[in-house]
Amino acid sequence: MKEINPKDTTRAYAFEMWMQAPNPMVTFFKTLDVSRIVRISRRKGLKLNMLMCYCIGRAATQVKEFYMLPVGGKLMKFDTIAVNTIVANSAGEVSSCDLPFSDDFAQFGSDYLRLTKQVADSCVDHDLSSESMVVGTSALAQYEIDGAVGMYSGIFNNPFMIWGKYKRGLFKTTLAISFLFHHTQMDGAHAAKFLDILQREIKNLKA
């Protein structure tokens, strides 16, 4: 992670307009067709949350704005992406686990299992925010929700995605997601592009 001059980037105007806004976060809603990864999860015994996190990481690496993030009033540049997941720990509470994104599916899956177990057992968060731009996620897989807004803490500016229980239809299985992002980091067009790429990655996942 290193500081960059906003004026030397495509985010110069956004930094000036949105950095000091009372609430600079924007939320998009989208319904994804997750039929393919639900089938893969069932047939291969892979965790659906891991498959979602992998596809999110794949999509994020294809949008250059994900490699920049406003942190502490400055614009920072990152070389790598990580995907965060929330883990139920051994104390009956939850812990945070940052997963380094690897395009190698087997490597990402191995890291997912190892790190989530480590965090669950130790009750100690695994934090990569000083070295990677972290995409936050929260899966409320037991509950039916239509979306979530108002997740801005004023401290963390990271993009964040939340979803609930998927819905089975006659021809496809769908998942409603909310995607929260800081307007300094990206514009609506970048966020929409990311969500379109995410849908494509889900439909084309080879595992």
Segments and roles (model prediction):
Residues 89-145:
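Helical lid/core segments from catalytic subdomains that handle acyl or acyl-like groups
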Residues 37-62, 175-194:
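Acyl activation and transfer enzymes in specialized metabolism, enriched
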